[in-house]
Amino acid sequence: MSGQFTISDLNRLYQRIIYRNERLKKFLKDPALSSSFEMKYAQRLLQEAVDNLIQNGKSGVVPEKDARGRLLKSLSDILKGKQGRFRQYLLGKRVDYSGRSVIVVGPRLRLHECGIPKEMALVLYSPFLIKRILNEKLADTYLSAKKLIRTNPLLVSQLLREIMKSCPVLLNRAPTLHRLGFQAFQPKLVDGKAILLHPLVCPAFNADFDGDQMAVHVPITFEARAEAWKLMLARNNLLSPATGEPLILPSQDMVLGCYYLTTNCAEKWSKLKKGSGMYFHNIHEVLKAYNQHLIHLHAVIWVNIQGHLETANNIEQPLEIRIPLNQKYFYSQKGSYTALAGRPWQLLLREDAYSSNGLIAEANAGNLPQINVAEGEVNKNILDLRYLNLNYMEIYSKTHNLLNVNHSTLVAQRGQIKDNIHLPQLTTQIIRTTPGKILFNIIVKNAIEKRPKLLSKSNFKGGFIKNKLVNAIDQEIDNYFIRKNTALS
């Protein structure tokens, strides 16, 4: 350029060695100078030139510089460092059909899915896209296919989504310390410029969402895609190949989200939440109301529950049980009721439920606020004519679940006739909870139901490894509740 020559730094260093070597030869040819001070100085200059070729400026030697005063790059300078020959050209290099971007959390993705920006996907899948356009006769030539991609974004997006269903991508995060640092995912087209990643696969990559970047590669050949689907798919790599420990564990944003779903607001603030105090017939009505923004996530609501429920007595409030007082089993005379239980349990009458009817004094007079039932059979008159105008009777159960107490029955007596009625036939279970806790329980239930399917898909058939996975998940849940209790206290 402009009559100037560009010379490599190595050529300058080799040139200096050649010049000094020729100078030393002249001294060696003259016997009078073979042992002189000038010849020893020439030997030293040659040695310094060779040292500068290997590592410029080593051991206090005057470094070689160009006309601008810049240090010349020696052999060691060319090999070492991030821009060196090994790291830039051998250990890592720029390849076709690859990209790089920042990762962000994608909570709505499946475990084996990732979100690829549309701008990046157009470049990565360009050979598949152009081939599809030409096969479907949407364009005649390569140039016209490229023009169609630029001018018809709606058609291109539709074709791109169909192509991405059968073409996986490989995600990698440096440094790749083990083989699970390179996994296959099914791509989904997303807006923006960031790659969406499921938070559960972060431990395998040792990644987080504070600005980490990941590389994307597209396997081109059929054999490479088949290997990615079979061996490298994220949902097929649940356990660490080195230790057998599970890699799919909740962390970071997921733990924070679980805590937010199950947190308890202060009583004075929970009453102000939208929808607090509402009653729902089942869980589906709660989810429907929440999706329609009719209730707040932390609103205290009452839900009718059928089935087995468990609560931790030191954390959750007791369950509320409602026994309907219908005319089928209760008459105008006193009824004698027997509770048969396999273990001691206790029922407490809710006095506040009768305050509007002025029945607190009557309940106290009839010795009704507390009914202790021990093992075996205990008879106690708990109903009178005075209470038959009620629609139901509310009681608290201090055990996990009144409906699931073994062999629990109520015996209704009318004269000499007794009707044995199972307690679940008479009771309706109402729970005081929040929509957030319902969502959390549904998520945990779905995860537990799908856990055997995930284990069956893995190649680990030993029961020991399966038990380690189950125990690790249970331990993680226990640790979460311990942290939650510590935060609440």
From Swiss-Prot:
Catalytic activity: RNA(n) + a ribonucleoside 5'-triphosphate = RNA(n+1) + diphosphate
Localization per Swiss-Prot or TrEMBL: Plastid, Chloroplast
Keyword annotations from UniProtKB, A to Z: Chloroplast, DNA-directed RNA polymerase, Magnesium, Metal-binding, Nucleotidyltransferase, Plastid, Transcription, Transferase
Positions annotated to bind Mg(2+): D208, D210, D212
Enzyme Commission number(s) from the entry: 2.7.7.6
Top-level EC class: transferase
Molecular functions per Gene Ontology: DNA binding; DNA-directed RNA polymerase activity; metal ion binding
Cellular compartments per GO CC: chloroplast; DNA-directed RNA polymerase complex; mitochondrion
Cofactor(s) recorded in Swiss-Prot or TrEMBL: Mg(2+)
GO BP term (any one): DNA-templated transcription
SUPFAM superfamilies xrefs: beta and beta-prime subunits of DNA dependent RNA-polymerase
Cofactor binding: number and manner: Binds 1 Mg(2+) ion per subunit.
InterPro entries: DNA-dir_RpoC_beta_prime, RNA_pol_asu, RNA_pol_N, RNA_pol_Rpb1_1, RNA_pol_Rpb1_3, RNA_pol_Rpb1_3_sf
Gene3D superfamilies from the UniProt entry: 1.10.40.90, 2.40.40.20, RNA polymerase Rpb1, domain 3 (1.10.274.100)
Note: In C.reinhardtii the gene for this protein is split in two.
Annotated family: Belongs to the RNA polymerase beta' chain family. RpoC1 subfamily.
Quaternary structure (record): In plastids the minimal PEP RNA polymerase catalytic core is composed of four subunits: alpha, beta, beta', and beta''. When a (nuclear-encoded) sigma factor is associated with the core the holoenzyme is formed, which can initiate transcription.
Function: DNA-dependent RNA polymerase catalyzes the transcription of DNA into RNA using the four ribonucleoside triphosphates as substrates.
Protein's recorded name: DNA-directed RNA polymerase subunit beta' C-terminal section
